[in-house]
Amino acid sequence: MKYKRILLKLSGEALQGSSKSTNIDKAVMEQYCEEIKTLVDEGVQIAIVIGGGNIFRGGQAESLGIDRVQGDYMGMLATVINAMALQSSLERHGMYTRLMAGIKMEQVCEPFIRRRAIRHLEKGRIVIFGAGIGNPYFTTDSTASLRAVEVQASVVLKGTRVDGVYTKDPEKFPDAVRYSKLSFQEAYEKNLNIMDMTAFTLCMENNLPIIVFDMNKKGNLLKVVNGEEAGTLIS
């Protein structure tokens, strides 16, 4: 395996599946667990950050008359709901997990302690990070970048519904062209919006590569971790 310790970033919306008839689609969850299990069987150390957009996004707060900070905390709680669902599903598939949160929730998860998180990874446990970094005004992309740097992951894998980074939105423009590789500088200059600027800068300053790939295509996660081209590498 090219990457021995990874940080996998998943979006909350992806858990809804294509029908979006429920907050969490069982078939999607099952597929994700099967993909992750293939890495565990290969000895890859896995940390996961999952969004909460299928339940609540902090950005919705203003339209609902909710204070921005309060809305961000609501979004953090949404990520914990998704993290708990993923944890249960992974354990049902025979994997060992630990859920760590950026805010205190002693009854359901551990607080984030960097050295403890690294030790969990070394012992082969999947570590799921919930509740963002515990502060408002930060996205789950920023959480992914920060936690990846903190636990010394060798790559951030951003699982999306498209197979990489394109010159423009491939869902709107059929003539969009996919990049196989980009430097951080190129991605910045082209304003490709791979992550928010805080998250992107953290990766760039720490020379932490990002791979954007289609998480919904079977076998893609294993290919990416193996170093095969199955998305866009930003480094």
What are the roles of these predicted feature ranges?
Residues 1-235:
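C-terminal catalytic "cap/lid" subdomain
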